[in-house]
Design a protein with these regions (language model features):
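Tubulin/FtsZ superfamily GTPase core signature
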Residues: 1-359
């Protein structure tokens, strides 16, 4: 009898959307067919939870809130999560990697997300927070709550990606409607999750396995740089590498990082020289002591494009801690995904390119 050889199981990756903002982000990911992950939506508001497209939905704090939400009070969100701590633990048990996503500043997401992250880390999961910071017009109280929630979350994640909503305005038309602006925020969250997840779930020419991702992201506790850039033509390698580390949303650069993953995706015409060029561009812009893990993969939908995805960690948190003491939008956070500054074409993996081409 011939037995099929098993070369290793794919990592179990779960994405937990907490509160209204997290739930919206989850719905956007499902609509855009993000693969290789399981989705969990957690909320105190039973009506909002019914709108979730997630396979796994959990109402927390039934006794505390009676299904009516947290009333923009993070302490209520926190207590609601603690009320269902064991159920949350059961949902996350057995995971290799857990993304915790929410919109910071409200009640459920701000209060419950740190609890979910703490449970995840205690279970031994690689835990990544991907959250947003409010628009300025949402008020000082909401901003203050958001900054406090971000610092609480930071204590319980391996890596944190924070997306300031105000910065998202840099990549959309000023006449964009409020609804579309919030949708774009959801898409940025989705791209961040998808960009990381696909590195470890999609087979490549030079694979980056989950152990590599864990080594770069585990226990860092800092805000991560995640950049995605696309290049075309003769100088596509240089163009993609530079776009990946220079974003209109970016407020940190790769120079302060100590660890990074660089993944290059292209059609079958990718050359060794192009991979070498990408790596040289990244190294020249970064700390000379940076430890880089690299990988490469094929995607036949790219039609001549070359994509570079960079995840960099190991930044000093000193300045970020000071931000909470003096809340300020201008001090904001770091980010992630970009559009080409010269036109309206998104830069990113094939799923992002195809999404644009459909419009």
């Amino acid at each position: 009898m011939v037995e099929q050889e098993t070369f290793g199981e794919k990592p179990i990756i779960k994405v937990v959307g907490v509160g209204g903002g997290g739930g919206n982000a989850i719905n956007r990911m499902i609509e855009n067919d993000v693969k290789g992950v399981d989705f969990i939506s957690i909320n105190t508001d039973s009506q909002v939870l019914r709108l979730s497209k997630s396979e796994y939905r959990m109402q927390i704090g039934k006794q505390l809130t009676k299904g009516l939400g947290a009333g923009a009070d993070p302490s209520v969100g926190e207590q609601a999560a603690l009320e269902n701590e064991e159920e949350i633990k059961d949902l996350l048990r057995g995971s290799d990697m857990v993304f915790v996503t929410c919109g910071m500043g409200g009640g459920t997401g701000t209060g419950a997300a740190p609890v979910v992250a703490k449970i995840s880390k205690e279970l031994g999961c690689l835990t990544v927070g991907i959250v947003t910071k409010p628009f300025t017009f949402e008020g000082k109280k909401r901003m203050r709550q958001a900054l406090e929630g971000i610092e609480k979350l930071r204590q319980h994640v391996d890596t944190l990606i924070v997306i300031p909503n105000d910065k998202v305005l840099n990549i959309i038309d000023p006449k964009t409607s409020m609804l579309e602006a919030f949708k774009e925020v959801d898409h940025v969250l989705r791209r961040a999750v998808q960009g990381i997840a696909e590195i470890v779930t999609v087979p490549g020419l030079i694979n980056v396995d989950f152990a590599d991702v864990r080594a770069v992201m585990k226990g860092k506790g800092t805000t991560a740089l995640m950049g995605i850039g696309i290049g075309q033509g003769e100088n596509r390698a240089v163009e993609a590498a530079r776009k990946a580390i220079c974003s209109p949303l970016l407020e940190i650069d790769i120079n302060g990082a100590t660890n990074a993953i660089v993944f290059v995706t292209s059609d079958v015409d990718i050359s060794f020289d192009e991979v070498n060029t990408v790596m040289n561009e990244i190294r020249s812009a970064s700390n000379s002591e940076i430890d880089i893990v690299y990988g490469a993969g094929f995607n036949m939908d790219l039609r001549g494009e070359l994509i570079v995805t960079v995840i960099a960690t190991g930044y000093d948190n000193k300045d970020e801690t000071e931000e909470v003491a003096t809340p300020s939008v201008s001090n904001g956070e770091k980010v992630v995904v970009q559009k080409n500054p010269s036109d309206d074409t998104p830069v990113g993996p094939s799923w992002l390119i195809n999404e644009f081409k459909k419009k």
